[in-house]
Amino acid sequence: MLNLKFIIENIEKVIEKLNTRTGDFSYLNKLLVLNIKKKKLIFNIETLRYQQNKISKEISILKQNKTNTENIFERSIFLKNEIHVLENDFKKTDSEISEILNNIPNLPHESVILLSKDNNKINFKKYLSPKKFNFNIKDHVTLGRNLNILDFDRASKITGSRFIVYKGLGARLERSLIQFMMDLHSEKGYIEIIPPFIVNDISMFSTGQLPKFKNDSYRLENSNNWYLNPTGEVPAINLHRNEVLSQKNLPLNYVVFTTCFRQEAGTAGKDTRGILRQHQFNKVELIKFTEPQDSYLELENMLQDAESVLQKLELPYRVIMLPSHELGFSASKTYDIEVWLPGSNNYREISSISNTESFQSLRANIKFYSKNKGKNKYVHTLNGSGLAIGRTLIAILENYQNKDGTITVPKVLRSYMRTDIIK
């Protein structure tokens, strides 16, 4: 969330930055008008309250002197009614301001490329060249079915489309990837977290999922405010909602395992084949709470930590720095890691690493006590997949496939899998 005072004092900069994003931000003009109206209402309410208090004292004196108070009492009633009308108008105006503020996305960082929608993403770096196969390759759907490790038909029977049943060595591979990633990141000092898979509406608002992505979330009908968790950052960031963190504990790093649930609204017809885009999927998420001056250094550290998973798995990938118009709602800067998928002959996103600066901490009221400033300041929060499990599984099946249809298990996973080949 952007601070109203900051927006008003830097309105030209805010408009300029927001116009590099996707969306119509003409409502900022309304915000300015409402803010002026709010100030006038506050002044008028305070003026009338002062008059009412003054009259109340006069009435008290008149009563002591047994003087007629009828006229002045009528004036007091009139002021009370006027104040009531103005207070209702104030509440309505303040609510309209809050609604606008809640829907304003974060501002792009100065290092983010400001590109038009027609420009391509910025290719930041690549790791490994895609393997050249000397046989006709298969995609993960065909491989999974032939090896009887991915069961789409029974998943559809159990639930519906965009769900999967992992079987045999497929289930073991999914589980091995989770354990491998959790082990790898915890060895680097991340604290392991397995949170609830159901979150409330305040948690969803705090990280920016609400109100923006309400239609892409699963809300529990028998509850007024519970949602199925859409991503690990929601419960992890809200671990410290309404808290003041110790400066000596920053940066505070978490590695979070969650099962995530998304409606994938607006993706009808996209990636319907296979497990690339599912309603339910597993993910290992990286979270950082940092001091403001350290957050962009920690963004680079988090990027390296996410990359290390693919490096140890020896999977080809590239890193993209997203231009301003592709940034997520809460993000100020984002790197996408895209893994090579031979089955589709393309790089596909497997992780987004983002710095939200104080955008989420303002919404969640997460601060730290700054000894230098002698006061509480908002932390910066960072999040990123480390990695999406299902997409990592796709990459392994397709990049490690053999001519006979078997899959060579990456060396780093063999102790988890207890085999070196899937057949």
From Swiss-Prot:
HAMAP family: Ser_tRNA_synth_type1. Consists of two distinct domains, a catalytic core and a N-terminal extension that is involved in tRNA binding. Homodimer. The tRNA molecule binds across the dimer. ATP binds at residues 262-264, 349-352. SUPFAM superfamilies: Class II aaRS and biotin synthetases (SSF55681), tRNA-binding arm (SSF46589). It is an enzyme of class 6 (ligase). GO terms for biological process: selenocysteine biosynthetic process; seryl-tRNA aminoacylation. The keyword Repeat does not apply. Its EC number is 6.1.1.11. Belongs to the class-II aminoacyl-tRNA synthetase family. Type-1 seryl-tRNA synthetase subfamily. The keyword Cell inner membrane does not apply. Transmembrane segments: none annotated. L-serine binds at residues 231-233, 285, 385. It is found in: Cytoplasm. This is Serine--tRNA ligase. InterPro entries: aa-tRNA-synt_IIb, aa-tRNA-synth_II, aa-tRNA-synth_II/BPL/LPL, Ser-tRNA-ligase_type_1, Ser-tRNA-synth_1_N, SerRS_1_N_sf, SerRS_core, tRNA-bd_arm. One of its GO terms (cellular component) is cytoplasm. Its main location: cytoplasm.
